């Protein structure tokens, strides 16, 4: 019985060590190919034309990363086409950008769904963003591209 308990405990602790960790990166160029497999030999599935578009990294194979975008498209992108710059997309209509990280501060602008925001920093449930010439704070749960 002790062996069974020991093996179960060992399984649960080592399982977490080998779990794949997902994280976000952004597209590093204006033109990026999403391929069906982890090589230049695979055909292009999607041609992205939006620099800093956030993508979720799900797996890796040598110099390629398997990604998923905000529309659930998945495929492989070469690491030279990815950037560590922080950005996110608004996932709700009429996202308010506030002067300070509180709903009681002055709203500065309203963003529509799908708007690309550069992330300066996040603090608790708020993120300081820049969109065009506007800067301010938005609720973290209204953004896609952050963990």
What is the meaning of each model-derived region?
Residues 4-13:
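Sec-dependent N-terminal signal peptides
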Residues 18-36, 46-51, 58-100, 104-133, ...:
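SH3-family beta-barrel domains
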């Amino acid at each position: 019985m002790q062996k069974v308990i020991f093996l179960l405990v060992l399984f649960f602790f080592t399982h977490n060590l080998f779990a794949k960790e997902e994280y976000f990166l952004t597209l590093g160029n204006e033109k990026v190919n999403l391929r069906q497999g982890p090589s230049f030999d695979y055909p292009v599935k999607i041609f992205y034309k939006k620099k800093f578009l956030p993508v979720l990294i799900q797996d890796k194979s040598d110099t390629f990363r398997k990604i998923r975008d905000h529309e659930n498209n998945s495929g492989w992108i070469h690491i030279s086409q990815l950037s560590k710059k922080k950005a996110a997309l608004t996932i709700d209509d009429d996202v308010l950008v506030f002067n300070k990280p509180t709903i009681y501060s002055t709203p500065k602008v309203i963003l529509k769904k799908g708007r690309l925001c550069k992330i300066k920093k996040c603090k608790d449930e708020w993120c300081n963003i820049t969109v065009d010439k506007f800067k301010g704070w938005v609720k973290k749960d209204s953004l896609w591209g952050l963990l």
